[in-house]
């Protein structure tokens, strides 16, 4: 199946101009012309599989021998429920003024953000049981599993300007309008620009299928954020100048002798725009979002160092191995690392008491299970946006404030690579991940204003986005069914009245706000409804999210032929070694940090909860040594 894949222009998303004072409506979306414009007539590429290969393909193809495209990159997201569009095919609800959904008008996405997600007292409520790494790991996993890129079609720069400056709705521009009393009206005009997500090429005559969005990534936990799901980029990310199986590293700067990611040569660079004096470019990584935030770039840096450490050690054990073998074996181990940390350490403290209900013990690969990431999962996993605190801390070797600016506002660190390269490296940031706490999601304190008003606003020269409004608008863009449809899907009650909804949410104020906005629980956008629910015992999501996340992760695991526990993927001795891996060991092996917590996802206090790196098990690679002739 061929898809339209248009990666967002990062600089365009940064340099927002003042919106014009009038709003005009463009033509209704025309799938025929859009499809012809991007060349949907071209034949789909033919994939040839090697059924005996011990390694995943970069693209995710060939995992399932019977259906090689299952879980592959650049395929449609799966629909667990049919799409719901205003016209039944492609127009999102809220597109046509005055048109209702289930008899009620939809509230503006920004109004929902202001009244439900925002809060006046900006002081965070921190999670007393989860470290900041807990939040960060969720983002790492999300960026390994899904990316539905924007599509910016039409008259190139003119089309984007119409969306950015004039709030012109049409084809792929679906601007987020501001309510009349919104404080952003004074500084940003009438709207925030919003480009609709890329879609799968429809089948002629373009009238039979609803619009389906793309997942540009593989659906497998395979560390594709390190290696890329795109063959040409995967090759660029490697150091092919020597047969050592290494990833390319930065040749211009280092972190006190340790590697940084290479710079991206793409110009203009939003990271250079942030600080025109420092002029530090964005990094090149397996995922295009690696430089969006400094903690994400820090995580990518750890993983590229670990790949090269693994490849180097494997070469020592197996001098006869060539570069391709070393690369693939290190990649295979790092993929297992992501799987193990996610299922052993992360998901149990996300799903809490619902873990065993939705993700039972592993029974082996099942080729009848479809691992494809579902459309709704791309919204369910956004619960992590509510765990992001308003500030980022940098800590010294004694886990005390580092340097003259140890505490930085979150919004100043978007596309901010210079803070890492020229102001301390990654160690102070990693210590902050280990010793500081995530934000706790509270029904009356959902998302920090740093994300709700200042997303991608690292300097005052740039207007900030609203992540909550974007998430809500994206639900409609993707044709997502409403809250109660998903409650029914998960065999949960479907509240219809204020009393019934309050019995689910257990919060009268929030319940009334939601019904005042939406009119009926049936219309509540899935992301909003899901994050509004009280948390399950010992978890960090409500019952609906536990269902959607649990179902997806079970399918990711059971439908993956290369899952680390599947017999034949690793030897028994190799699996015994892999069971000892830990994020703390990753830190010990790839930074100059010497004190780490044993359980890095829990909230930890220094020094009582920290141990020397010598107390943390190392990954024993001796089972990977080939038998000597």
For each predicted feature, which ranges?
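Alpha-helical bundle segments that constitute or directly flank the non-heme di-iron/ferroxidase center
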Residues: 293-305
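Amphipathic, well-ordered alpha-helical segments in soluble domains
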Residues: 306-310
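Terminal regions of secretory-pathway proteins
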Residues: 2-294, 312, 317-629
């Amino acid at each position: 199946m061929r898809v339209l894949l248009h990666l967002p222009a990062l600089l365009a998303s940064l340099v927002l101009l003042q919106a014009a004072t009038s709003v005009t409506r463009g033509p209704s979306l025309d799938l025929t012309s859009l499809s012809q414009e991007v060349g949907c007539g071209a034949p789909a590429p033919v994939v040839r599989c090697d059924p005996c290969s011990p390694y995943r393909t970069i693209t995710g193809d060939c995992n399932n021998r019977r259906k090689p495209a299952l879980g592959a990159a650049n395929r449609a997201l799966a629909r667990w429920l049919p799409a719901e569009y205003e016209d039944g095919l492609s127009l999102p609800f809220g597109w046509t003024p005055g048109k209702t959904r289930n008899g009620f008008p939809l509230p503006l996405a920004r109004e929902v953000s202001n009244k439900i997600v925002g809060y006046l007292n900006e002081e965070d409520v921190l999670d007393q049981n989860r470290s900041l790494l807990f939040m960060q790991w969720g983002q790492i996993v999300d960026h390994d599993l899904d990316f539905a890129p924007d599509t910016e079609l039409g008259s190139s720069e003119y089309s984007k300007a119409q969306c950015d400056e004039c709030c012109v709705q049409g084809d792929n521009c679906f601007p987020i309008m501001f309510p009349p009393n919104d404080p952003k009206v004074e500084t940003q005009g009438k709207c925030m620009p919003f480009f609709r997500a890329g879609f799968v090429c429809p089948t002629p005559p373009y009238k039979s299928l609803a619009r389906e969005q793309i997942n540009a990534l593989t659906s497998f936990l395979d560390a594709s954020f390190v290696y890329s799901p795109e063959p040409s980029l995967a090759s660029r990310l490697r150091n092919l100048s020597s047969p050592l199986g290494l990833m390319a590293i930065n040749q211009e700067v280092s972190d006190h002798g340790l590697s940084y990611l290479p710079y991206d040569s793409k110009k203009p660079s939003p990271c250079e725009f942030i600080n025109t004096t420092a002029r530090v470019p964005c990094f090149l990584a397996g995922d295009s979002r690696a430089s969006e935030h400094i903690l994400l770039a820090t995580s990518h840096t750890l993983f590229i160092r670990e790949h090269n450490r693994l490849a180097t050690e494997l070469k020592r054990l197996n001098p006869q191995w060539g570069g391709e073998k070393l690369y693939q074996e290190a990649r295979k181990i790092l993929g297992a690392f992501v799987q193990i940390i996610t299922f052993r350490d992360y998901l149990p403290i996300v799903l809490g008491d619902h873990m065993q209900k939705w993700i039972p013990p592993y029974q082996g690969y099942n080729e009848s299970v479809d691992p494809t990431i579902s459309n709704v999962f791309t919204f369910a996993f956004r619960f992590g946006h509510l765990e992001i605190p308003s500030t980022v801390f940098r800590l010294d070797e004694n886990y005390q404030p580092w340097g003259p600016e140890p505490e930085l506002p979150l919004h100043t660190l978007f596309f901010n690579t210079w803070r890492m390269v020229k102001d301390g490296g990654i160690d102070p940031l990693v210590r902050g991940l280990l010793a500081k706490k995530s934000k706790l999601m509270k029904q009356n304190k959902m998302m920090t204003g740093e994300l709700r008003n200042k997303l991608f606003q690292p300097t005052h020269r740039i207007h900030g986005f609203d992540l909550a409004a974007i998430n809500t608008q994206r639900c409609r863009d993707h044709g997502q069914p409403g809250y109660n449809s998903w409650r029914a899907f998960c065999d949960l009650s479907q509240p219809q009245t204020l009393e019934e909804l309050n019995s689910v949410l257990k919060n009268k104020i929030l319940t009334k706000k939601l019904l005042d906005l939406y009119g009926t629980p049936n219309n509540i956008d899935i992301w909003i409804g899901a994050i509004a629910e009280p948390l399950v015992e010992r978890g960090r999501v409500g019952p609906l999210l536990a269902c959607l996340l649990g179902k997806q992760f079970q399918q990711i695991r059971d439908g993956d032929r290369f899952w680390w526990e599947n017999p034949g993927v690793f030897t028994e001795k190799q699996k015994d070694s892999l069971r000892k891996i830990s994020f703390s060991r990753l830190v010990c092996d790839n930074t100059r940090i010497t004190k780490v917590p044993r359980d890095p996802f829990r909230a930890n206090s220094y020094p009582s909860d920290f141990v020397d790196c010598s107390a943390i098990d190392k990954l024993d690679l001796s089972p990977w040594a080939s038998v000597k002739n």
